[in-house]
């Protein structure tokens, strides 16, 4: 099945919004669980509007990996990174044990798009790793 994810400002991604497309087995990476259609230009020149990105489901990524994310109800394809939160935001990134957590950052390859700093106050999840 294919779902659209934004390579831009965000696209709704849910399990009820899909189509089935046939591909030769050789076109699909072995570990792919599903494919999503890229929508937009923020990941150019690597990922293009309309291209299928093949996804391995996972809930964690390392900085520098490209993934599919749900953030505030929208789906994104971006490069994952982490940074120490700004001083003003540290309270929101500190758990009840006093441990300071890193802030997730979603980065576009196309430099006309600013990095998206993930707020701990908004729903965020890693859906999977892009394999192609």
Residue positions per predicted region:
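Extended boundary segments
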Residues: 1-22
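Acidic/glycine-rich C-terminal interaction modules and beta/coil loop segments
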Residues: 26-132
């Amino acid at each position: 099945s294919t779902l659209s994810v934004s390579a831009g400002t965000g696209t709704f991604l849910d399990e009820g919004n899909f189509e089935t497309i046939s591909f030769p087995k050789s076109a699909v990476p072995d570990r792919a669980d599903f494919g999503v259609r890229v929508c937009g230009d923020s990941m150019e020149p690597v990922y293009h509007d309309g291209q299928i990105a093949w996804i391995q489901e996972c809930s964690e990524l390392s900085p520098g990996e490209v993934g599919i994310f749900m953030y505030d109800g929208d789906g994104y394809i971006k490069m994952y990174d982490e940074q120490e939160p700004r001083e003003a935001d540290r309270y929101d990134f500190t758990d009840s044990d006093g441990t300071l957590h890193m802030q997730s950052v979603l980065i576009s390859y196309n430099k006309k798009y600013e990095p998206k700093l993930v707020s701990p106050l908004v729903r965020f999840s890693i859906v999977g790793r892009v394999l192609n």
